[in-house]
């Protein structure tokens, strides 16, 4: 079953968990790594078992916890090319985890099919994601 749980939402930080079976994907990491790991654990998800992190854009309220989080866990981080370029300089312990994906270029993450799509925003390379799994589909941005 495909599930979505908000860990935080708003101008002070954004992070959410999307799960399908044993696949767990973090959407944005705009809160502290401690809040992310505490939130995941409260949902019964070991942070080390995250399948991937999907980043919508490089603004602080979407990535502020990413640098510390990637010191502790090592999931692949997917983002649009422009966002990957911005994040590479901010992730001294995680730049090698970045995987660039163009809007419209779908890819698999465990039991999920992920398709990025362009979104209008003042951040270069801003994307949302359509996630499909377990017979369900959701769009997030």
Can you describe what each PLM-predicted range is?
Residues 5-16, 52-66, 71, 84-88, ...:
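Structured catalytic core of nucleotide-sugar glycosyltransferases
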Residues 2, 45-48, 93, 112:
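Structured loop/turn residues at beta-strand edges in well-structured enzyme cores
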Residues 1-43, 127-141:
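Conserved beta-strand hairpin/beta-sheet module of binuclear metal-dependent hydrolase folds
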